[in-house]
Structures are given as structure tokens and as C-alpha cells.
């Protein structure tokens, strides 16, 4: 396995040797029929292993299932190798039943740190969650949301009238962020994309690229009249008043890709699609 650090740098050989055991392969599948069939076939070949005691976990499904698996295994140190048995497979490798062990040993690894969201709801209740793709804020009613944006304690935009706003990681920059006309960020870049969703005022503001070390604070103006929900990947908190977002440096997940099809290569290719 070619092991890469969180910014695409190779890890020292001393750190690679302890991670080379990939004998115990666990399989997890989405509810898609194709994923369930693949699970049955691969477990007949390789056996049934508990994901929490495996050397590597193979996720069968699409990107949604891959994200769920990443959340389950965050900070366990167990590498995840996705094979596409779903509709969207940006984070997945091609599906094949043959030579799986050889593919795993030849795979390249990317380490990803999530964002941590701390949302304070009306009434004072707080809820935290992590996001590998993005944290997004979305209006709950027909009226536009009004949001104040602060970065590292400094107010950068006093009032943004919009349908919402999102903060995306390089991994998530090709997902919802791209659909909202945000920039694609190279994997390994020390950056985050702050992208408005259907901004009404200021109409010409197209977002910002900020350091991944930044602390972003989003305050909801007129929260009673213009309620807003915050979403970290798949977890939603409704009626928020403030949302604090920063990179979670204490947690990470390891993703495996076939040689020549690394996450960095996929992000680069995405920028030349029309």
C-alpha cells in the first residue's frame, strides 16, 4: 500500500510497516440489491469478519454508503476500500470479485480529517456532529435566510440573504458545493470552500476560499421569523441560532484507491468535465 498523509505526503517507512496487514477483510453493504448480492459473493470467498476487528473494510454501494462507513469507522485506524455497487461512485473503486487481496495491497491511501460542527438551537440546546463533505445551512421556510459570517472571530459579511450557505472540504468540494457553483479544491490543499446557496444580497458575492485552519461562525439573523437548519453530511439540526465550524484535527479516516485512480486524480478529472 502507498500510504499518504493528510496533505498527500508519504508517511515514513516506519509508520507503513505496522499498517501493511490486510488479511482480515470485512465487507459492509448498502441496501441496494446489487450491493447485497456482492456482499454474499465476497463473503463466500473471503469469509465473514467483524468490521471493528478487521484489517480493512470493503464498502459495497455508492458514495452515500461510503460516507456512512466513514462515519462508523472514523478514528479506528481501519482503512476503507469502496467498490461501486450504487448510483454515484466518486469515492468508490470499480467493482470486481477477482484479485481483491492484490488490489488492496497495491492501493493508495488518503487520510481525511472531517469538519466539526457545533450548532446552538433556539432555546440554547447544543448539538455537535462531524462532516467529511460539507456543513450546510438551509432556510426552513419560504423566506430567505439572513446569516452573519465571521471567520476567526472577525465579521466578514454582516448580512447574507440567501437560501443557505455551506462550508466544504476538498473531498466535498465536488459534491453539493459544485452544484452550488462553488470551487473545486485539490485534495491535500489546506483550504475550505465557503459557498452561498442562491444568494440574493449581496448578489455578486460568490463565496470565499479560506484556510482549513480557520474557525467559521455563522449567526442566524431574525431566527424566529427566518428559521434555518444546519446539516453535517446527513445529520440535521433545525431552528439553529449559531453554527461553529472548524476542522477536527483529532479525528481522521483512511480511504484506499486503486493506483492511477486516487482521490486527487478524480478531483482533477472532475474539473475538465462538461
Identify the residue ranges that each predicted region occupies.
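Short glycine-rich anion-binding loops that position phosphate/pyrophosphate groups of nucleotides
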Residues: 62-65, 86-88, 171-174
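Proline-centered loop/turn at the N-terminus of a beta-strand
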Residues: 77-79
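Short, low-complexity intrinsically disordered segments enriched in A/P/G/S/L with frequent Arg
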Residues: 5, 9-11
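ATP/nucleoside-binding phosphotransfer catalytic cores, i.e., glycine-rich phosphate-binding loops
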Residues: 129, 137, 142, 152-157, ...
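Gly/Ser/Thr-rich active-site loops/lids in small-molecule metabolic enzymes
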Residues: 159-162, 166-203
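ATP/NTP phosphate-donor binding region
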Residues: 2-4, 15-60, 66-75, 95-111, ...
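Catalytic core of DAGKc-family lipid kinases
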Residues: 88-164
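A generic structural signal for short beta-strands and their flanking turns/coil linkers
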Residues: 56, 111-115, 131-133, 143-147, ...
Amino acid at each position: 500500500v502507498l500510504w499518504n498523509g493528510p496533505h498527500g505526503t508519504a508517511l515514513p517507512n516506519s509508520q507503513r510497516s505496522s499498517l501493511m496487514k490486510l488479511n482480515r477483510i470485512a465487507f459492509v453493504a448498502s441496501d441496494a440489491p446489487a450491493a447485497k448480492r456482492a456482499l454474499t459473493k465476497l463473503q463466500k470467498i473471503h469469509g465473514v469478519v467483524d468490521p471493528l476487528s478487521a484489517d480493512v473494510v470493503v464498502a459495497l454501494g455508492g458514495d452515500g454508503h461510503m460516507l456512512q462507513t466513514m462515519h462508523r469507522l472514523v478514528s479506528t485506524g481501519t482503512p476503507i476500500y469502496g467498490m461501486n455497487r450504487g448510483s454515484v461512485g466518486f469515492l468508490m473503486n470499480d467493482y470486481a470479485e477477482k484479485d481483491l487481496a492484490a488490489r488492496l495491497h497495491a492501493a493508495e491511501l488518503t487520510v481525511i480529517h472531517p469538519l466539526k460542527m457545533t450548532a446552538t438551537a433556539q432555546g440554547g440546546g447544543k448539538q455537535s456532529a462531524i462532516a467529511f463533505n460539507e456543513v450546510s445551512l438551509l432556510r426552513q421556510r419560504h423566506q430567505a435566510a439572513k446569516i452573519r459570517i465571521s471567520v476567526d472571530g472577525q465579521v466578514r459579511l454582516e448580512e447574507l440573504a440567501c437560501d443557505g450557505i455551506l462550508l466544504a472540504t476538498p473531498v466535498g468540494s465536488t459534491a453539493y458545493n459544485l452544484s452550488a457553483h462553488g470551487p473545486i479544491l485539490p485534495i491535500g490543499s489546506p483550504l475550505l470552500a465557503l459557498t452561498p446557496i442562491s444568494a440574493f444580497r449581496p448578489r455578486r458575492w460568490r463565496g470565499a476560499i479560506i484556510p482549513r485552519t480557520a474557525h467559521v461562525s455563522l449567526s442566524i439573523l431574525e431566527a424566529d421569523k427566518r428559521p434555518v437548519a444546519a446539516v453535517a453530511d446527513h445529520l440535521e439540526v433545525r431552528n439553529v441560532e449559531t453554527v461553529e465550524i472548524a476542522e477536527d484535527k483529532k479525528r481522521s479516516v483512511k480511504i484506499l484507491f486503486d493506483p492511477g485512480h486516487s482521490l486527487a486524480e478524480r478531483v482533477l478529472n472532475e474539473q475538465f468535465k462538461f
